[in-house]
Structure formats: C-alpha cells, structure tokens
Design a protein with these regions (language model features):
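Boundary at the C-terminal end of the N-terminal hydrophobic targeting segment
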Residues: 28-32
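Short, conserved catalytic-motif segment at the N-terminal edge
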Residues: 33-91, 111-113, 120-121, 127-128, ...
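Short, surface-exposed loop or secondary-structure junction motifs
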Residues: 65, 69-77, 130-353, 358
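Peripheral terminal and inter-domain segments
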Residues: 312-313, 321, 343, 385-530
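Short, well-ordered beta-strand elements
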Residues: 347-348, 358-361, 365-374, 506-507
Length: 530
C-alpha cells in the first residue's frame, strides 16, 4: 500500500477502539486454539506486507507452555541485522506498568500508601490549583484524571532536552488544567515522571536503579535496560517513519533517529526484547510471583494495579466492521482495563518516534501477547488483535483488511483536514520590521527560546531542545513557521501579539493538525525577556 501511518495519539485511539469489546449474542469462545509457529507466521507476515513493515517482534504466553518468541524482518532498513528474540525495542508507555509495580512494592513495604497525599513525600509538589495540590494522591499520579490536558508538559522531554526529572515539579504549577480534578480522563506523562521522583525520594535509589535491581534482575530480563542511555551492542531495533510529503505519516518509509531523553524514563524509558516482556507478562498474570515462588508483590497489590480507576471511553459495543470495540474502557494503575469479546483484557500501548509496542493479557485464559514494531504506525495493534482472536478461538475476522481500511480512512480524513496542504502560507504579513521580533522569550514551565535576525531573515532556537533550531518563514499576520530538520519533530507556527509597536506575547501551535499530542506547543505562553 502507499505509505500512511498513524502517530502515537492515533495509535492509542486505534488500540482502544479496536482492542476490546463485550461479546454480541451468538458469539462463543472456542477452546484455546493450537497456534504453532506456522500459524503465527501466517498471521504476522500479511500485516508486514500490507504496511511495508521492516521488523516485528512477537511474544505469546500460554498456560503450561514455554513462551512463543520470534522476530521477523530487519532491525533497520538498509542494514543486514535481523530482528530476533533478543532485539531491544523502546517499549515506551508500556514502561508505566513498571513504575506502578515499583510503587506497589513500596506500598507493600509500608513506605508509602496509595492514598497518601503526594506532598507527604514530596513537600515541594505543587499543581496549578492549590486545592488540587493538597488532594493529589500517589494513586492520582498514575491514572490520568488530574485535570491536566492531553500531553501537558511533554515538550519538557520530547524531543530530547536538557531538562531533568526535577523540572517536572517546577513546571506543574504553570500547567493550566483543562477540566476539574478527577472529573475525567486525559492522558499525561508528566505525573509518571513525578512518580519516578517519588520512588527515588522514598527508596533512596534512582528510578533507573530501582527498576534494574528490584524488577529487571529478579525477573531475569537480561536484555532489558531502564533507559535508552544504557543501550549497548548492535541488536537494537531501528526507528522508521514516513515523513511526507505532505505531512508526517505519508510518503516513503525512512530511517529516523531516536529523540527521547532520560527525563522521560519513568513514563516511557525502558528498552526490552520480546524474551524479556514475556517474563513481565508471566509475573503479571501470576499475581507478582516468580517461577520459583518468590513474590515481587502480593496478590492484593496485583489486584490493586488492575482495578479500574478512570473511565476512558464507552460505546455501544461491537459492530460488524469493528467486532471488538469496547463497551467500556478504563485506566487502572499503569494499565488499560477493558472488555475483549466478553472477557477482561489488561493492556497497554507504547509509542516513540519510529516504534510502537503493544502488550495485552486475558488473565482468565492465562494468555498474554506482545507485539513490537520498528515503525510508528498501527500495524502492531492489528497483529495483536489477530493473535488474541486466534489464541482464544474467536470468530474469524480479517484484521489485515480491517487495518488497511481503517488506515486508508485515516489517510482520507487527514488529507481533508489539511486541504491545500500545510505548506500553503495564509494571507497576511508581519506588521513590524523583522528585527522587532528578535529577542529572548521565556515560558514559565518550558524555558526560553531565542529568535535572531540576520540579513533580513529570522531564526529560532529552543534553548532546552537543541534539535528545535530553524529558520522562520512568514506565515500570516505577525506569524511565522519553522522548518525543523527532517525527522526532528513536528513544525510549529509562532504567533506574536503586538501592542504599541512592540511584541508583548508569543504563542505557538503545531503546524499540522495531525501532530502527535506530545508536541504540545499550544501549551506554551512566552513573554519577552527584557
């Protein structure tokens, strides 16, 4: 097919929209299907062909059987290295369940309580609303009901910046809520970073040290590292994306470079192989117990982590086009919990620039599946659903055709949304001489940008984010656009407010309406530094 891919926002929506549902009348579970290597191959390879996927890793966990583990394709286009069962992928937001488990272990040790106020352990913690500061609990850090808007603060750490985890605490008082506290669901990463700071404060170990010594080592996750900074060797999955034209998500598949930094780790930092993640799924379904009987956490804590806390979405349930659409989707502690054909599914997705990973468990069947892809499209979600259906004997459904159809519809919608393209400047011109826009501007949660004027041209540098450096082009009245290097991230539109012949304010938004939510330029509010 011609290239089109979804971003992390869309991958998450596709995952929630197609991964789980209440069974409709007449559907019945067959006995767990015998799915051998040839059967898995027959499910995976058509997806790879349809989506032009360079590489896939698969793990399947079943009762009384060793895990099925296999790699497909190549680590990086243009290079010889093959994906195998020890190839490391960035598991991104699948890391959130590790942060939740770390907190559960500290709860077991009575060092914290789930319903302790965060300020009990982090006295410097502040939210925009002082009342919310006092009410926010350890549990609230994990369940996406803080009132913060989607992706708030993500520009602190994505792409790589000079910010450190403590800067999340400094930023939070300036991030305005989009809704009331505990009034609804909006996905965030920043509060998981705060959770990582809390783990360090209480345990005396950095989040990375805690994950490595308390989880990865006991589990024998020998390929895994808690942060990309610790990756070594060549057996690492590459990153691939379609960078346009006209927008990211379309055009030929290209190799891109990782752009996440260590500040992101407690929300999305772990790198692991499918061999590793099979062990994680096994200990999850065993209620925290290792094969030797040792408990990393109790069954009570296992149940606590899977208990729904926040309603994510609801619908009328399955349709012929989407037979696993959830009736209700919820978020627990580091996991989505929802229905899949009438039974509970515990799952998560994770997206980085150039990679998407999926994990899912059907605990009542003892079945777990992980699918890792080295592209940023939705192929891993379709493969996951196909594997789950095959493993549970669900009614036949053509997930390849469905995924291709959904992708084409998304492409059509995208093209309609950017009709005329994103490279057509709106009418209007700057009202001031270009030198008047030059200077240093500061945002209270992100930091500074510097705009320079040289020989009649403007340029911008985001001070904490080195890769965000670009010439500026006029883009309507008192507005300009960036052209960041290919693969560096989404471009932004800058709008200057002018009063009495001087700039008084600078705001931004992503150029493309389809930009991933982590490019939260719209949350920035700069003022000139005098």
């Amino acid at each position: 097919m011609s290239g089109f891919q979804v971003n992390r926002r869309q991958a998450l929506a596709l995952s929630l929209g197609s991964a789980a549902a209440l069974a409709v009348p007449g559907w019945a579970w067959a006995a767990a299907a015998e799915l051998d290597e040839a059967g898995v191959d027959a499910l995976v390879r058509p997806f790879m062909a349809a989506f032009e996927t360079p590489g896939i890793g698969v793990a399947i966990v079943r009762p009384n059987l060793p895990p099925f583990l296999k790699g497909y394709g190549v680590c990086t286009l243009g290079k010889a290295g093959a994906i195998d069962t020890h190839t490391r992928f960035g598991i991104a937001s699948n890391s959130k369940s590790f942060t939740a488990a770390s907190l559960a272990m500290l709860v077991e040790e009575k060092k914290i309580g789930w319903d302790d106020p965060v300020v009990k352990h982090l006295p410097e913690f502040r939210m925009y609303d002082p009342a919310v500061t006092q009410m926010m609990t350890v549990r609230d850090l994990l369940v996406h009901r803080s009132g913060l808007p989607l992706g708030a603060g993500d520009l602190l750490y994505f792409p790589t910046s000079t910010h450190v985890p403590a800067d999340a605490l400094k930023a939070l008082p300036y991030l305005k809520p989009a809704r009331g506290f505990r009034a609804g669901y909006d996905y965030d990463n920043i509060l998981y970073i705060v959770a990582g700071v809390l783990i360090e404060r209480v345990s005396g170990m950095s989040w990375q040290q805690f994950i490595a010594t308390r989880l990865l080592a006991p589990l024998g996750m020998t390929d895994a590292v808690p942060t990309r900074a610790q990756l070594s060797g060549d057996n690492v999955a590459g990153r691939h994306a379609r960078l346009g034209p006209p927008i990211r998500g379309m055009g030929p598949m290209k190799v891109i470079q990782p752009d996440e930094g260590p500040m992101f780790d407690a929300a999305a930092g772990i790198n692991a192989s499918v061999t590793d993640i099979a062990k994680w799924l096994q200990v999850q379904m065993a209620g925290g117990r290792l094969p030797d009987g040792k408990a990393l956490w109790s069954r009570d804590q296992a149940q606590e982590m899977w208990k729904p806390e926040t309603i994510v979405a609801s619908s009328d349930g399955p349709t012929p086009e989407n037979p696993t659409r959830p009736v209700t989707s919820t978020y627990a502690l580091g996991w989505f919990v929802q229905d899949y054909r009438g039974v509970r599914m515990v799952s998560h997705s994770g997206g980085l620039s150039g990679q998407v990973t999926q994990t899912a468990m059907i605990p009542s069947r003892g079945i777990g599946v992980a699918v890792f892809s080295n592209t940023e499209d939705g192929v891993s979600g379709g493969i996951r659903n196909a594997l789950l259906d095959a493993l549970t004997g669900a009614p036949a459904f053509d997930w390849v055709a469905s995924s291709v159809s959904r992708t084409r519809k998304a492409q059509e919608s995208a093209l309609a949304e950017v009709s005329g393209g994103v490279d057509t400047a709106p009418p209007g011109t700057p009202s001031l001489p270009l030198k008047a826009y030059a200077g240093r501007y500061s945002d209270p949660w992100y930091g500074d940008v510097v705009i320079t004027e040289t020989r009649g041209k403007l340029a911008i540098q985001f001070v904490p984010t080195a890769v965000f450096k670009s010439a500026l082009e006029p883009w309507g009245p008192d507005a300009f656009r960036t052209r960041f290097p290919a693969g560096a991230g989404e471009d932004a539109v800058l709008t200057f407010e002018v009063k009495d012949g001087a700039v008084t304010r600078l705001t931004m938004k992503a150029l493309s309406p389809l930009a991933d939510f982590s490019y939260d330029f719209h949350h920035l509010d700069f003022t000139p530094v005098r």
